[in-house]
């Protein structure tokens, strides 16, 4: 928050550039938490409520390692305004698809970095015949990740795919592909799959990749079934304001 506050209010730089800088360099950068954190500091997420870094606070919590001189940091936030963001419909699972999934004998699993614990949860008991963890070559350019972030994410993907392969007793396909959809089709056909299942990515670069997969697989008669973890399905409807109202609603719901 110190960094974001200094960036926005002292240096007077656009918060969007700061968020992009963080997302480019943070190894575990997350589209949602990164964006929301910067918006909150700027006074946009909770309109009118800003976070302004103080020199004494920085000096105290860094044990004097960083002690900005008096008057160097902005003490009054600048007013940032924007047009209201459009409402986005909450995605929900297709119950007909979930029913049809039970009828398939040969199912493949697509693993991506947004959920690398597929050996637990809703997919854990499926009879998976093959696991795919192919890396789309162009995603780094589209996401703006640094080389270190890309390498770290690729290593995490390999680790998650290896665990998935061991859990399901299935062969893992990895490597890079220029066209993820075409690569998945070739993989699915070679493994005689009737369906491919995956946790649906959230808004961000992996969802952008995922949206093209369904139609491409369907064109060769292979179903793509999206899942979402139960806790996300149950909690998302409560995420309409800040953290504390969200927490209170979850507690009230039991």
Features from the language model and the residues they span:
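Trp/Phe/Arg-rich N-terminal binding region typifying the photolyase-homology
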Residues: 24-27, 33-34, 85-254
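Active-site-proximal binding-pocket segments
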Residues: 1-96, 101-106
């Amino acid at each position: 928050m110190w960094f974001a506050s200094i960036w926005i209010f002292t240096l007077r730089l656009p918060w969007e550039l700061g968020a992009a800088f963080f997302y480019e360099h943070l190894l575990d950068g997350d589209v949602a938490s990164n964006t929301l954190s910067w918006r909150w500091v700027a006074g946009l997420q909770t309109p009118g409520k800003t976070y302004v870094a103080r020199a004494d606070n920085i000096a105290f919590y860094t044990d004097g390692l960083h002690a900005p001189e008096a008057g160097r940091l902005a003490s009054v936030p600048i007013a940032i305004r924007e047009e209201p963001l459009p409402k986005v419909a909450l995605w929900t699972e297709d119950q007909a698809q979930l029913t049809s999934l039970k009828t398939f004998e040969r199912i493949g699993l697509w693993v991506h970095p947004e959920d690398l614990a597929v050996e637990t949860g809703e997919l854990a008991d499926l009879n998976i015949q093959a696991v795919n963890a192919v890396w789309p070559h162009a995603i780094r350019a589209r996401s703006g990740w640094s080389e270190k972030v890309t390498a770290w994410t690729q290593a995490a993907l390999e680790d998650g795919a290896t665990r998935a392969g061991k859990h399901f007793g299935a062969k893992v396909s990895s490597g890079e592909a220029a066209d993820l959809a075409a690569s998945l089709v070739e993989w699915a056909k070679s493994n005689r799959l009737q369906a491919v299942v995956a946790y649906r990515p959230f808004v961000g670069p992996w969802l952008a990749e995922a949206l093209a997969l369904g139609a491409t697989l369907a064109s060769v008669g292979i179903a793509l079934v999206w899942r979402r973890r139960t806790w996300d399905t149950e909690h998302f409807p409560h995420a309409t304001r800040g953290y504390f109202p969200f927490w209170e609603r979850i507690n009230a719901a039991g």
